[in-house]
Amino acid sequence: MEANKREIVDFGGLRSYFFPNLAHYITKNDEELFNNTSQANKLAAFVLGASKDAPGDEDILEMILPNDANAAVIAAGMDVCLLLGDKFRPKFDAAAEKLSGLGHAHDLVSVIDDDKKLGMLARKAKLKKTEDAKILQALLKVIAIDDAAEKFVELTELVSQLDLDFDVYVLTKILGLISEETSDEVDIIRDNVVNAFDSCKPLLKQLMLDGPKSEPADPFISLLMDPLEESVGKVVNHIAQLFEEASKNEGDESLVLRSQLGYQLFFLIVRSLADGKREVSKKILSGIPTSVRAEVFPGLQRSVYKSAVFLGNHIIQVLLGSKKSFEDWDVVGVAKDLESAWKRRAIAELIKKFQVSILEQCFDKPVPLIPQSPLNNDAVIDNVNKALQFALWLTEFYGSENETEALGELRFLDSTSKNLLVDSFKKFVQGINSKTHVTRIVESLEKCCLSDTPSGRKSNVQPSTSQQQDSAYTKEEMTTVHNTYSVNTKAQVLNGLSDTNSSGLLVDSKDSLSLQEISCDEVDSSTLLSSSRNIGEGVTVKAVDPVPEKVNDAQQQQTVNEIEMASDANQDTSSSASPEVAPSFSTDGWDSPTKSVALPPGMQQIDEEETTVADKDSTPQPQARAETAWGSGDATPMPLPAPTNQYKVSGFGEAKVAKGFGQFAPTSSAYGGGGGRGGYGGGDRGGRGGYGGDRGGRGGYGGGDRGGRGGYGGDRGRGGYGGRGGRGGF
């Protein structure tokens, strides 16, 4: 490993070895140190005289051994740890491991606990003339001395020999080596540092000579920073005087000012509750003149002030972690006031004012809620606000604490707050006379705690039923189909093939691993199309002709009626004048026009009917019904783009394959076996029979609207000359 070398770094005239990171920070942040000392690094502010507060150990370590330090900074920081004494020795050892990980070694790690080896190392350093040796020699002398004055003398050698005035000045302040005996010498070293700043950082020179830039202190704000018991009388009097002066005018400015002053009084009340000094709130009320009190506490609010204070203090202290006992609500009058609807409303209004006073800046400058508290002010305000919100919940849902709406309003409480409240109220209910109200509070909190657990959330889920999904389209599905109507045939088929959960247009993917099978129950014999074929635009399909199971007449009639209703709705949607339907939602929740147009999973394919179905009152226009990918009469209740002329089907009567929809096959005739859209008796979709017409076609002499499958006489014919339900021919 490479041994550490002690090298001096120059930052624009400011030389440093022990504190290179601090010197770099000071020279780069001179404006912040001068204009906003409170936001600057504590060690830097203390060294430059901008702050009188000495930095803590963590503040020092943050500067001498930063997390992202390189090997040179770590090695120098290890030397500083030795200078700062035994309490920093663990940091020295930890830094040694970190330095080793970087491929470097500190020369004092192996000898620091051996006085004999340290003495030998000091004698060798004394003989050398390098800066590295002089720094090491001074370092070893200082760590071997306990007396502060002697330490200071040895450190001054670094000033005279190496011009390390900045490092010596920093060590003097951190180690507390300034005394009456050393003050003159320290001033000289300080002047040397100031002169170094003269050429590179004049703001730092001004800071060290004149101190930090400061504004005149506001006497009222300073009074608010004093302990509450000592300052509350003066603060209330000051606010009351301003209030009375503003009351002489009735303009908007006066009303705004009086409102602000009123919230300042509420801020003081909340401060007394958060600080655990509830009796001070009584002193605040008594110190407010009658005229001011009538405006700040109108109507019933004066009557319920005590109840609002006791209730707020109780909840605030619980969420701030207090373990002390609380007065019975029956004894202090809280319970009685809560029983009255009008007094509950008055208490709620006061609690809302308490909340506003701490959430808004009532004073000209930010004022902490509890100035003497070591806790973070934002954390204190957050807990107090939650406590006041819970107190407000108690008033608004009095008597209905366990109802669903009330439980839902407790979402603002985190699990820790809920547990604190449950534990506190369980103890509280044991020592009071009337337990009904508090018991309801405990039960509601326990229900909320239970709902936060995985088992609780699971128990709230309603069991699903296995009811069959309605075959009719929903509004969202209709919207999705309309938005996908403009997509070309290839995109629609590919999207359908990619959806393994779709039903209606596509069969389940388990029936085919390499090729999706399209259910073609309205296309003629599957023996001619059992092999895969390219249907155009790079899409390959394989047709099958499943024989559907028969269903009972009642169920069949219901299914047909639902599909007809959905078909009417689809036609209305497709004929809308506006091309945009907003918003559309696909099955996976994305608002996109590229989603599959397959039917919902619960939708069933329509089986062949065995009963006669009554004609509808109004039949959709042929043009609208023909706008499907498979031709007219399609049972699939959705509009699809017009097909290309690549589709090939055959007639049931073993006619040759037609060249396209709307074209005659070479052998088709007036009694043909199912050509294209032409032919005297041919099916509109390459129908299945001859003279009798096709299953779904409109054409054919006397063909049924959903005509038969057979030849001249129909192999399964049921109907006569015409009729929508007829299966046979003439």
From Swiss-Prot:
Chain positions covered by the region annotation RNA-binding RGG-box: 674-730
Keyword Disulfide bond carried by entry: no
This protein's name: Guanyl-specific ribonuclease pgl-1
Biological processes, Gene Ontology terms: gamete generation; germ-line stem cell division; mRNA export from nucleus; mRNA splicing, via spliceosome; oogenesis; P granule organization; reproductive process
Gene that this sequence comes from: pgl-1
Annotated transmembrane regions: none
Domain notes per entry: The dimerization domain also acts as a hinge; changes in its structure probably impact oligomerization and RNA-binding.
Reactions performed catalytically: [RNA] containing guanosine + H2O = an [RNA fragment]-3'-guanosine-3'-phosphate + a 5'-hydroxy-ribonucleotide-3'-[RNA fragment]
